Amino acid sequence: MPLMSQARSLGKYFLLLDNMLVVLGFFVVFPLISIRFVDQLGWAALLVGIALGLRQFIQQGLGIFGGAIADRFGAKPMIITGMLLRASGFVFMAIADEPWLLWLSCALSGLGGTLFDPPRTALVIKLIRPQERGRFYSLLMMQDSAGAVIGALLGSWLLQYDFEVVCWVGAVIFVLVAGLNAWLLPAYRISTVRTPIKEGLMRVIRDRRFLMYVLTLTGYYMLAVQVLLMLPIMVNEIAGTPSAVKWMYAIEAVLSLTLLYPIARWSEKRFRLEQRLMVGLFIMSVSMFPIGMTTELRPLLMLISLFYMGSIIAEPARETLSASLADSRARGSYMGFSRLGLALGGAIGYSGGGWLFDTGHALNQPELPWFMLGTIGFLTLAALYWQFNQRRIEPAMLGGH
């Protein structure tokens, strides 16, 4: 086997192992935050939404700087430092008994993600051939779903002992991942040239096509982040037990493991990337409207299943399209900036969603936040349609590869 092909093959397997552990460590802790602080301790959903939004905004909003630094110094030191920072965030979360401590823990967790997420994403572009990326992103999403279920199951089981134990287990997992990267990850350069930090940043900022695409996705992410805030709260409220949240993630895992890869293989040969993204977002948006009027667990889980189906269709296309638009001379910077939509959407989706949830309950209108989210989804869909039709992306980039 040629040396480069061998490096790609080994790198692919390491990326899969690394991703599985990162997802596991994240989902041991984060799905239980809203249950712990809102349902068990009685905090306002807005306070917890601010904490989750802060983590999202720091991790994704500052990602361009993490990516630019990785372009300059390489992936390995950034990834290791980021993993250790996230572990420290979980340690602070274990002792959080006031909102400011929860906010600090989420900020540290987000800062860690700022450092490790863009170089890890750029390594996928470096090591996976363009024609294989769509399917590889589907494999990563399948891993995400399986890891989410295993993590949520483990976290729910540990929660019966104490939330501190949940946080410490999450911290240990990220320390383990840092050790594996220190031991096994080669000192890869993620860009084709050693790009100065400022040049990488400016290259992205001048790319108006990429900027518009990233910012338009803010509305998409406002819907997507509710799997960590309002959906777990709804499941817990209707079922009456935190352990029911695991069924939500089990549904995601079953759908992803059985349908995600076949749908990606089938659709990439028949539809352009932007078509797949918009169809998925349409399904996600439609599923939002009835959730607030649901009073039984089975219909709620059916609507959540519909939401996940939309995500399964949209997410591989979104990730592949972002990678296709990245300039190879500044991959880290591009992948860092591509998270800005997630930063804005996450911050608004978490804090705004928490506020709408509290307001809806205070006004005895529990359907209010879900109606607003569905409306935002359709507005985003209209903006994407306008963008893809008024400012055409090159056909080569919109193919399935």
Curated annotation (Swiss-Prot):
> What kind of membrane protein is this, topologically?
Multi-pass membrane protein
Gene3D superfamilies in UniProt: MFS general substrate transporter like domains
Any GO MF annotation of the entry: transmembrane transporter activity
The UniProt keyword set, sorted, is: Cell inner membrane, Cell membrane, Membrane, Transmembrane, Transmembrane helix, Transport
PROSITE patterns, sorted: MFS
The secretion signal range is none
| One GO CC annotation | plasma membrane
Q: Per the annotation, which location comes first and is thus the protein's main one?
A: membrane
Spans through the membrane: 13-33, 34-54, 99-116, 139-159, 165-185, 214-234, 244-264, 277-297, 300-322, 340-360, 368-388
Q: Which InterPro entries match?
A: MFS (IPR011701), MFS_dom (IPR020846), MFS_trans_sf (IPR036259), MFS_Transporters (IPR050171), Multidrug-R_MdtH (IPR022855)
Q: Where in the cell is it found?
A: Cell inner membrane
The entry assigns this protein to a family as follows: Belongs to the major facilitator superfamily. DHA1 family. MdtH (TC 2.A.1.2.21) subfamily.
This chain belongs to the protein called Multidrug resistance protein MdtH
